[in-house]
Amino acid sequence: MKEFLAYIVKNLVDKPEEVHLKEVQGTNTIIYELTVAKGDIGKIIGKEGRTIKAIRTLLVSVASRDNVKVSLEIMEER
């Protein structure tokens, strides 16, 4: 699933080399922490959050096959 998410995000941004994805596993829960270049955050979120909502919907659909809850968080660069 991590590779699937990375593929989607890298094809949306201008700087795919700056896409970093961290997977944090819990019991029946996976949290993905996504970091992208500052200029690409708007492309990931999309107009009125539509793009990030669609990405999250895809993740939930894929994860439901394995009875796992999944969450995607966009992390701020420091």
Swiss-Prot record:
Domain of life: Bacteria
Chief site of localization: cytoplasm
GO cellular component entries: cytoplasm
Keyword Cytoplasm included in the entry's annotation: yes
Residue ranges constituting the KH domain according to the UniProt record: 29-78
CDD domains the UniProt entry points to: KH-II_YlqC-like
One Pfam family of this chain: KH_KhpA-B
GO molecular function: RNA binding
Keywords, sorted A to Z: Cytoplasm, RNA-binding
Location(s) in or outside the cell: Cytoplasm
UniProt xrefs under PANTHER family: RNA-BINDING PROTEIN KHPA, UPF0109 PROTEIN SCO5592
Entry similarity comment: Belongs to the KhpA RNA-binding protein family.
Biological function: A probable RNA-binding protein.
Name assigned to this protein: RNA-binding protein KhpA
Species in which this protein is naturally found: Chlamydia trachomatis serovar D (strain ATCC VR-885 / DSM 19411 / UW-3/Cx)
